[in-house]
Regions:
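Juxta-kinase regulatory segment immediately upstream of eukaryotic protein kinase catalytic domains
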Residues: 1-6
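ATP-binding pocket architecture of kinase catalytic cores
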Residues: 12-128
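Active-site catalytic-loop/activation-segment of kinase and kinase-like phosphoryl-transfer enzymes
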Residues: 112, 125-146
Length: 146
């Protein structure tokens, strides 16, 4: 039985800009996970992403640990370890400059370690991928009602 199959309830997570459906998923044994359900068209991309997360975890980087990846009736799913806490977006401004700087240094060290992994072979030029990502973010920003 997969972890996905042992989920007994879900609570929607309404954060982020992706169109994926996100949930805090609960299992009968009391464990909980971050569940992301995406369209099947994203299968290959998300499979690579899950593999990269496993590689990053193997480096000792703290992240929501990748637990399971698969296909369900709703699309392709990714299950990550749930980490309780608060969003840095709300917490960082309440910290003094020294603490903010310390977190920035730690994040930089983590990124340096992540960048030690070999880069995947791109299927298209970086500039095209980046422009497409920016265009999507700009469109989402413009559509945001705030």
């Amino acid at each position: 039985m997969t972890v996905f199959d042992s989920i007994v309830s879900r609570t929607p997570v309404d954060k982020g800009w992706s169109g994926d459906r996100k949930y805090k998923a609960f299992c009968a044994d009391g464990s909980c996970y971050f569940l992301r359900i995406s369209p099947m068209s994203k299968f290959e991309k998300l499979k690579r992403q899950f593999s990269h997360m496993q590689q990053v975890q193997a480096l000792g980087i703290r992240l929501c640990a990748p637990v399971e990846f698969g296909v369900c009736g709703e699309g392709v799913y990714t299950l990550l370890q749930w980490v309780d806490g608060r969003d840095a977006e709300g917490v960082l401004p309440t910290l003094d400059k020294k603490a903010q700087y310390a977190y920035g240094l730690e994040a930089g060290r983590m990124l340096r370690t992540i960048h030690s992994l070999p880069s995947p072979v791109p299927t298209e030029p970086w500039s095209l991928r980046y422009d497409r990502k920016l265009d999507a973010k700009i469109a989402a920003y413009r559509a945001c009602p705030i």
